[in-house]
Each structure stands twice: as structure tokens, then as C-alpha cells.
Amino acid sequence: MHINLDSNEKIKGYYDSPWPAECGGPRRQKIPRSPGLNISNGEYLSQKTRANGEWNVMMVLRDPGEVFLLGNNHSNSTEKYGFLEKIDTYSLECISRSPNLPSGGHTWCGGVVVHENGYLYLNNGNYCYKLDPDCKVVASKKLPQNSAYNSFLIMKDGNLVMKNIEHAWDAKSKFVILEPEFLNQVADEVAIDENSMGRIAMDIDTQGTQWVYVPGRDTFFRYKYEKASLTLDQSWMPKYRTLNYEEQSFSWDACISDGGCWFLDNGDNRANVTIFSTRPFGQDLPARGSVFQGLSSSPQKLFRVDIKNDKKLEVVQPFDKQRGSIFSPPAFDPIHKVAIAFDTGNGLLAGLNYSKDLGFKKLWEK
């Protein structure tokens, strides 16, 4: 299987932009397709801040100068909604804004992506919206599960793949596929064997086959996408959670880079327990200061699984502190062979050199 860089060229299905989706593209490599800031001697960066009193989740880029902000209601708001804004690149002020978009009552960070057809697709709660570049709603779809969904993948046929998030062990996470014109559902939902919290990633191999990677509570799975359907790859099912739940909890998102599926464990924390204690999610929200307090006693760990062989699972412990937690994927620089791991709960960041022959070597910690 061949690993490419999302930043090398236009991604099939995605708009021709330096940053058309969260993490920069479906492999979640977080590398922008741009030459950098090109700051010269005597030049400097200045900062501009705008506060809108809402939960600002992410930004994506469309044409040059077009920046779109996805957000949703403030945690204390009685109205549960999402929104899309086109913002000025210098002042950050709103140029145009969608109406408040119903979320089915859920408060959770969704996602936004720019499709190669020029439209933007927004997910908030259990709704999906299609919007034009002026933030006007073109189509909307209530999704099948009474659950929050966490963002999209765009496949090369233009379809959207989504998954609902489930914290409870006895709940089912399911894939749903929507066509991009009217947001009609394509085929039946596909159930995942374990509840899943993290966002999905996608890779394309040298034969052009698309693989969707999804974290389960104990196991990472991948599904082959073909003819608008998803089929579980039973030859690749690495089990990463090997300790009891008091010691180790689930993974969130993965980064697909340089022949590996990279992810962190210990994703559970006090915020999750509070947010997912109600349905719709987020009716009760955690007290400030408790959000990132981890529930697992084992220190944060970084994993790499070879995408050709799930038996080649490597793990390293970058930090020594307990009760850490994470919400996001690690990063791996395939040029310099450096992995970036973190522990949000304890405020730690580390860089680790990796080679397939020698494994991990810690370079620094902050």
C-alpha cells in the first residue's frame, strides 16, 4: 500500500485548495499545500483577535482569500445549533453567515469540508448541510442515528462518508454514505463492531483503492470503499487497548503517513463522561478546568501500526505522567521521520524520531 502526501496535489473529491478539510485532508497529516509565509528580514507577524461568544471549531480554505469558519453554540446556550461564516482574512470579521443550523439538540464539534463541486458540506449534531460559498443552505439531511456525527470523508466518486460518535460500550457506531447532490442516503448503514469516538481517516493505495480507517474502543478497523459500499477488511484489525479500562482508554483520530497508521490512546476524560451522559449529547457540560482530566492511570502512549501488516504494532511511552488525555491525532513528518505526540491533560508535547529498523528515539519534550 502506498502512502502519499495530501499536500502534494489536489485530492480527488476535494476542492483544489491548500486546506480544504480539517487536518488538511483525509489522511489527517496536517501539512498545508502552500510554500509557507516567506518572512524576510525586518518583517514580523502581528496578531488579530475576534471574540464572538460561540464555540469556534475549525476553518477551511476555498478560493484564494476565501476562509470559512465552522462553529456551534456556546456551551451555556439553550439553543443548540451550528453555523458557517465566510470571514475577512485580515479583520476576521464576518462577511456572510448561514442561519443557525439545527443540530438535533446535540452540542458537539462537527466538521466542514470543501467539495470539488464548489459547495461546502457542514456536519453538526445529527444533521448534514450543503451550503454555497455565500453560506446559503442548498440542502439538508437529518442523519439516521440520534447521535452526534463527527465530520466527513469525501470519496473520489464524490460521495460523503460519515460516522456517529458513541461513548457507551453497548452503543453502536455506524457508517452512513450520502450522495452530494441532494444528500440522499446511499445503501444501508454499516455497523462497526465496537463503539467509536474518533474521527475517520482515508488512504488511497497504488491501485486506486480507498481505505477508511476507524478507531474502535479496543481495536482499529479499516473498510474497503468500492461502488458506494464499505466492506470490513478482516485481515487488518490491530488490537491496541490491552489494559483494563481503569488503566487505558480508547483512541481518537489517526494520521495515515509513511506506511503507518499513527494514533494515541487514553482518549477518555471527565468532559466525555459529562457530555455523553445525556442524549442528545451535551445537555450537561463539564465545569471549566476539568475538561482534560484523564481517567486512565497509565501514561499517554503513541502507536504505529504498519498498514500492510497489522501484527507490526509498535508503541512508545513519551511521557511519565498519569491521568493524561487527548482529543486529536498525532502527526508524523515523513520527510524528517519525526512523530509529534502530546498529552493535553498534562500539557506535554514531544518529538520522536522513528525508523522501521530502529523504532522510536525521543528527541525532545516540552
Predicted region positions:
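Beta-strand-rich domains and repeat architectures in extracellular enzymes and scaffolds
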Residues: 4-82, 103-110
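Conserved beta-propeller blade signature
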Residues: 18-20, 66-69, 119-121, 159-161, ...
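Beta-propeller fold detector
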Residues: 19-23, 95-100, 138-144, 185-191, ...
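Blade-loop segments of beta-propeller domains
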Residues: 52-58, 72-74, 80-117, 123-125, ...
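Repeated scaffold domains used in trafficking and secretory/extracellular systems
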Residues: 52-59, 103-113, 145-156, 194-205, ...
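Beta-propeller blade signature
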Residues: 82-92, 172-183, 220-227, 280-308, ...
